[in-house]
Amino acid sequence: MSANKELQQGYSDYSAASDQAALLNRLITAMQKGELTDELLEHIPELGDAKKLNDKLKYRKSILEKSIAEQAAKNKKNGVKATSTSSPSSSTSAPAEKKAKKDGKTGGAPPKQAKKVDYVTVEDYGSSIFGRLQSLFKKAIEDAFPGLDVPLLLAETPNPQFGDYQCNSAMPIAAKLKANKINKRPGDVAKEIQAKLPTKIDFVEKIDVMPAGFINIFLNTDYLRRQISLLASEGVKLPKLTRKRVLVDFSSPNIAKEMHVGHLRSTIIGDSICRLFEAVGFDVLRVNHIGDWGTQFGMLIAHLYDRFPDFLKKLPDISDLQAFYKESKKRFDEDEQFKKRAYEYVVKLQSHDGDIVKAWNTICDVSKKYNQIVYNYLDIKIKDVGESFYQDKMIELVKWVKTNKPDMLREEDGRQIMFPTGCDIPLTVVKSDGGFTYDTSDLAALKYRMLEEKCDWNIYVVDSGQSLHLETVYAAGRDFGWYDESIQRVEHVAFGLVLGDDKKKFKTRSGETVRLLDLLSEGVKRATEKLIEKGRETAMSEEQLVAARDAVAFGCVKYADLSHTRTQDYVFSFDRMLEDRGNTAVYLLYAYTRIQSIFEKDEVKNVDLVKYIASTPTLPLDHPGEFKLAKQLLKLSDCVLLVLDSLMLHQMCDYVYQLATLFHDFYNECYVIENKEGEKPFVHMHRLALCDVTRKVMSTCFKILGLREVNKM
C-alpha cells in the first residue's frame, strides 16, 4: 500500500513538473518571438503596464511627428529656414505645448494643485492638543500679519527644557517681510504672534518667546491629568468632524482569477482607510471595482458549458480557478471551433441572452465565493460594483460628452479621444470599432460617483503604476465640471510592491504569482508553530488558542503592510512579522494581553475602579513613566487628524507602537498591584485607571488597523 502511494505521488510530482516545464517553455517561446501572450502578461504584470504606457507614448510621438511635419511644410511655404537637421522625432522644431511635469513617484502624472486643500473640517477638537494649537497659532498669525501666506511650522520639542511644543513660523515670516522691504527681527515677529494668542489657554501653562524667534509652549500638567480622568470615565472620543460621504474603491480582483499577493496591499490599505472614516462618523461606501466584464468571458462560458453542462442546476465545483482559466485560454488559442463559439457567446452576453447571462453569473458566483474566503479571513466588508455595472453608463457618458462638451473630443484614426487640461497623453473614449476602453469605464465610474452617488470624497486605492492614468481621468472630471477640487476630494492612494527576500516581486519558488489563500494559510501554520514553540497551547483553551492564532496570523500580515510607508515597496517576511519585539503586530498584541491579564487578577474589581474614577476628577500622575504614557494617550486625536489628511496608515502604526513601548516601560517601572510580604496586595487605582485608558486607546487603534483583540496570547 505504501509503495502504491509513493508511486502515485511520484506520478503526481512528475505531472506537475511536466506542466511547469511546458509553461516555462511557452513563456520562453513567447519572449523569444516578442509575443505578449496572456500567460506572459500574467506572469510578468509589469509588461502589461509597460505595454499600455508604450502604446500611449507611441501615439503621442505620432502626434508630435505630424505636428512637426505640418510646421515644416508651413515653414517651407513661407520661406522660413529650418533651424535644425535633427530627426522628425526631435522636439526642436515642434510647436510649443503645455506638458505635464514628470514625477518618478507618480509615474509621470500631471502635477496636482500647488496649494494644499484642508478637506477635513473640524467642529470640535476634543482631546486633541496639537490640533487646537494649530488652530490657535494659524489665527494668531493671520491676525498679526493679514494677507501674508506662510506655512505654520509647529512641532513637538525633542528637549523638554524647551517645552512640549514649539512654533517656528517667526523666521520664515521675517524673511518674507524682508522681501517686501519690511525689516523685523524674528524675535519681534514671535512677540507679535504671541500677542494675538488668547491670554488664557486652558491646556497651556506658559509660552516663552526666544530672541531667535522660537515660541516654546509648555502644557498645563493638571489639564493633562483631568483629560486622562475624562478618558477613563467617558471613554475614547475622537474629534467631531463635518460629516462626509466617502467612496473608497479598493481590492478590485478580476473574476475567474484567484486573488493573489498583488491584491494584498489594496485590500488591506483600503479596508483600514474605510475603518478610519467610519471611526470619525463618515458615511462610507466600500466599493469593489471587480473585473467582471470583457471578451474573455466568451471562452470561459464556452469552457463552462463543456466541463459542467448541468451548471444551470448546480453550482459547479471548480476547485482551481486559475487552472479553469488556463484550460479555457489554451482551447481558445488552439481550437478554431472553440474560438468561434467563444466569440458567439460574447455577442450573446452583450445582448443579455438569458442562458448566457446565467453562465456569466455562475462564473462570477464561483469566483466571488473564493474571494469571500479571503475577505472573511481578513475581516473585510466590501460591496461588488464591477465593470458590468458601468456598461450602460458608458453609453450614457459618450452621449453626455457629445451633448455637453463636444469641443473636448477629437477624432484620430477613427477613435474619439480627448486631452484633459495639463495632460499630454489622451484618453480614448470610443475605439475605432465603436467599442469602449478602460478610459471610458473609469470616466463613467467617476461621473456616477460624483453626480449620482454625490460623494464628497472619492478615494482610489490602486498601485502606483496607475497614477498617470488616474490623474488623467481626474483631470477630465474637472474639465467636465463633475467636481470642484477645492471642495471635493478625489485622490489616488498609491502604494508600492510586495517584494520577496531577493528584493524582487514576491513569487513562489517556481516563479508563480503567490495565491492569497495560500499566503494566509501559511500565516496560520506559522502562527500556530510560534504559539506552540512558546508553550502557549498548555496555558490556553483550544478556543483561546484558535483566537490567538488567527489574531497573530492575519494581524501580522496586515500590520506588516500598514506599518510601512505605503508609497514604498516592502519585503514580505513571515519571520520578521512574527517577531515579538519591535514594531510588529505580535508586540502590540502582547502589550494588550498584558493589560488584560492585570484586570483578570483577583485583587482587581471593576466596580472599585468605576467608583474611584467617578470620585477622582484629576488623576494623581506624578511618576515620569505615568506622565509619559498619559501624554502619548492624549495624542490619539492628533494622530487621527494627521492620518485623515495624509491617508498614510504607518503614522497610526507608529503611534500605537510608541504607546505599547511606553506602556511596557510604565509596567516595568510602576507597580499597578504591589505585593509586600505579610501584607494584603495593594492596588494603585490611578495606575489601574491608566491601564484601562491604555487598553481603550489601543482597542480604538486596533479597530482602525483591522487587528483582532485577544485576551490571552
UniProtKB/Swiss-Prot annotation:
Biased-composition ranges for Basic and acidic residues?
A: 96-105
Which Enzyme Commission number(s) are on file for it?
A: 6.1.1.19
Q: Where is this motif: 'HIGH' region?
A: 252-263
Alphabetically, which GO biological process terms does the record hold? arginyl-tRNA aminoacylation; determination of adult lifespan; negative regulation of gene expression; positive regulation of gene expression; translation
Question: Which sites bind L-arginine?
Answer: 252-254, 263, 438, 442, 466
Q: Which domain of life is it from?
A: Eukaryota
> Which enzyme class, named as a word?
ligase
User: Cytoplasm among the record's keywords?
Assistant: yes
Q: Where is this region: Disordered?
A: 74-113
Molecular function via GO: arginine-tRNA ligase activity; ATP binding
Q: Where is this region: Interaction with tRNA?
A: 583-597
Tell where it localizes. Answer: Cytoplasm; Cytoplasm, Cytosol
Keyword field: Aminoacyl-tRNA synthetase, ATP-binding, Cytoplasm, Ligase, Nucleotide-binding, Protein biosynthesis
Bias type Low complexity, positions: 81-95
**Reactions it catalyzes:** tRNA(Arg) + L-arginine + ATP = L-arginyl-tRNA(Arg) + AMP + diphosphate
PROSITE patterns referenced in this protein's UniProt entry, alphabetically: AA_TRNA_LIGASE_I
Name one cellular component (GO) term. Answer: cytosol
| Family annotation (InterPro entries) | aa-tRNA-synth_I_CS, Arg-tRNA-ligase, Arg-tRNA-synth_N, Arg-tRNA-synth_N_sf, ArgRS_core, DALR_anticod-bd, Rossmann-like_a/b/a_fold, tRNAsynth_Ia_anticodon-bd
Identify its protein family: Belongs to the class-I aminoacyl-tRNA synthetase family.
Its recorded name reads: Probable arginine--tRNA ligase, cytoplasmic
- Tell me the classification of the organism that encodes this protein: Eukaryota, Metazoa, Ecdysozoa, Nematoda, Chromadorea
- The primary gene name is rars-1
